[in-house]
Amino acid sequence: MSGQRQMQHKLGPQRNPAIDEAVLNATRELLVENGYAGTSIDAIATRAGVGRPAIYRRWPSKAHIVHDAVYPVTESESVSDLAIGDEIRRLIFGAVALFGDAATREAVPGLMSEGRSSEELRRALISDQLEVIREELGRRMAQAVEAGELRDGVDPDTLLDVIAGAAIFAQSVRDLQDQERLAASLAEIVLNGVLPR
């Protein structure tokens, strides 16, 4: 076997990005139309115009497909070097926009339920995705404390939970539609608190 063929054999066939995109687009459409429970791998395959084997070569479960369809790839740039107040405001507006997307609203409750049923799924679908953001936010907050921009003792994990939790609950549970108002109100509470100064 030639070196090139050995390499192809070890790596497997090249993935066709058009199939990936068709599957993810079909998944987003079906989530909006049918919700998480009503979205199946069969329906995704039919809508995308691909076979089930092509899907299972790429994703081990419906939960993994849905996750990739609604969540962008998380990179370290998720936290910037803005002043800490502006950075927190940016994270709030970004979380509200992400969790307010029509497909994401339908996906989140199902993904959370799946994550509760399996530690492996919880890590793959929830924890690992947020880890980069948590680490970067913690780094930025530590710098802000040193610079006198942020009071000491604010836990970055709790702050991120407050932001994501409020964005998810308001939009996936309460079905709030006014994203701008939600984000502005959440930013005001997070940055300024609720007690009179």
Q: Where is each model-derived feature located?
A:
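Basic, helix-initiating cap at the start of DNA-binding domains
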Residues: 1-34, 38-47, 53, 64, ...
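Amphipathic alpha-helical segments used for helix-helix packing
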Residues: 66, 70, 99-127
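Amphipathic alpha-helical packing segments from all-alpha helical-bundle domains
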Residues: 86, 106, 120-146, 156-158
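Short amphipathic alpha-helix in the helical subdomain of ABC transporter nucleotide-binding domains
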Residues: 16, 133, 152-160, 179, ...
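C-terminal peripheral helix-coil segments that are non-catalytic and often amphipathic
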Residues: 1-7, 90-97, 135, 139-146, ...
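Hydrophobic alpha-helical connector segments
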Residues: 76-108, 159
